[in-house]
Amino acid sequence: PRIVPFGDISLNPGALVFHYGAEVFEGLKAYRTPNGEVQMFRPAENFKRMNNSAERLCLPQFDVDDAVEYLRKFVEVEKDWVPDQYGTSLYLRPFLFGTDADLALHGISHATFMVIACVVGSYYKSGLAPVDMLIEMDDVRAVRGGTGYAKCGGNYAAATRAGEKAAKKGYSQVVYE
């Protein structure tokens, strides 16, 4: 493991992540306490869920304790980016993607684990105020036996159309029937 400056990455065009969506991710935050200490919210739980998602997509598993320790080191290096204004935090996006260069669909033996970060405020423009939600009747996000429980890019890509529809109608989010 190594911590390097943010930048582009180079991948073989045949990498499974491009052709079969072999990718999972998580999202968590580092924040400052009132006394200035930097903390993260439940990183081990996020990494356990990430491993569950990876298992569903046949991506390699990783050691949760090691991942938490690496993330702590990353946050320590980047601690100056953790804001101290109320309602703000450093958003951490760990992700794991299949890098096998093969057009055949199979379990993945080679993967890359990365973390990127950015400063964020509230997820919704309205902050902590209630939001209006569209009840989506046409598109579905998950089916029995599918990947709905996994945090994988395909689930979110498939939800984009409903999200755009909701935004055009003035809603902040979508609830699927």
What residue ranges belong to the model's regions?
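Extended, Lys/Arg-enriched charged tracts that mediate electrostatic binding to polyanionic substrates
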Residues: 83-97
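Intrinsically disordered, low-complexity linker/loop segments enriched in Gly/Pro
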Residues: 77, 98-99
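Short, charge-rich binding segments
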Residues: 80-85, 105-107
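Helix-start/capping segments and mature chain N-termini
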Residues: 1-74, 102-177
